[in-house]
Amino acid sequence: MPREEVYGTGKQSIRYAAKVDLTRPAAEQPYLHNRWHPDIPFAGTIKNGETVKIECVDWTGGQIKNTDDADDVKNVDLTKVHYLTGPFEIETAEPGDVLVVDIQDVQPLEDHLWGFTGIFDKENGGGFLDEIYPKAAKAIWDFEGIYCSSRHIPGVRFAGLIHPGILGCAPSAEILATWNRREAELIESCSHMSRVVALPPLEQSAHAGSADATIKAKVAKEGARTVPGRPEHGGNCDIKNLSRGSKVYLPVHVKGAKFSVGDLHFSQGDGEISFCGAIEMPGVITINFKVMKDGMKQLGMKSPIYVPGPVEPQFGPGRYIYFEGFSVDEHGKQHYMDASVAYRQTSLRAIEYLRRYGYDDYQSYLLLGCAPIQGHVAGIVDIPNACTTLGLPIDIFDFDISVEKPAEKKDRGSCAFASDNPGAKA
């Protein structure tokens, strides 16, 4: 559809800077790309001070379906992700400036009122707890206005804190080279480890928008993968609080900024622990763009800054159950100030707690990735243990999970598993 389409009929009509087609493969759409590279052509131009709507596909490009098995999650092609909309030229933006991204609204597409949460198979993506829960699983969520619920995790309903997982401007050629060098060094230094520690450039499945064959080949060879966030530009930070009313301040490294956005989430818990842990969806985001000239120098900016908006689910400070975790792993081994070990233990304590009500562990793992849980680093100085906490909202359940109330265990159904692994239920 033409990018000139506008929304509304009054003086403040908002145009679409880009629209997507969910019936068409993501790799064939010129407004999308799945690598970071300064040479990817502009998908459109946005004026300094302009507000626009930008449509996005889900981060996998439509690979996950509304079904009751997790075959699609198990076999997802992760060489294709993330599909982002952009990059956009922001008029007057130059290296050294700061791009002010004012998120005015985020919504699902009207003809796609559902999303998904997944646990990747340990052999294809894995996740935060994949040594304990190695099998693929999935939950489908239906949207009802601001609320969501899932047939795969019954007894739960909550308002979404809808947000983009990825916001970023293109790296310069020098910054891209820095990324590739330092991540290659990490891969080499961790070659003895049994897990993937970083993803180097990969030519397979690279999509460079409307680039010609020469530029596409260069992007495929050099382009940075979109999986990690990086300090120089933000990117895939998966910060659940970047919802309506938020402002994000992004460093600009190339002329025109080359801003991209994607990986929209209906809801997410702090940490997005199952990797595909948010409620993933295609959707539309409304953004106002302003350029802060020479902003990087003014702010002494070395990484993005954000101010959260005033919109979030209101449970109240007394309506959470908090679980604690420390740098002692599930085997009893002591680690030194390891917040990742601590947060794994925090997550496991919450999963064990929900087991008492009849949820299987995979259902709870999925839920902790996408529900509006509060994750915090409580202590990071008391050697040898970091202490982390996870706050589970009591009111997302349609039954009482209060600590002092005896737990009533019931059949809570099942999430979706891969068809060749029906016995994955914990």
Role assignments for model-derived ranges:
Residues 2-76:
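N-terminal, Lys/Arg-enriched amphipathic/low-complexity engagement segments
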Residues 27-37, 77-85, 225-233:
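Short, structured beta-strand/loop micro-motifs enriched in basic residues and often containing a Trp
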Residues 46, 90-93, 242:
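Short, well-ordered loop/turn sites that connect or cap secondary structure elements
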Residues 59-70, 106-118, 256-266, 377-380:
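Short, Lys/Arg- and Gly-enriched loop/turn segments at beta-strand edges
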Residues 196-337:
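Conserved mixed alpha/beta catalytic, RNA-binding, or beta-rich assembly cores of soluble enzyme
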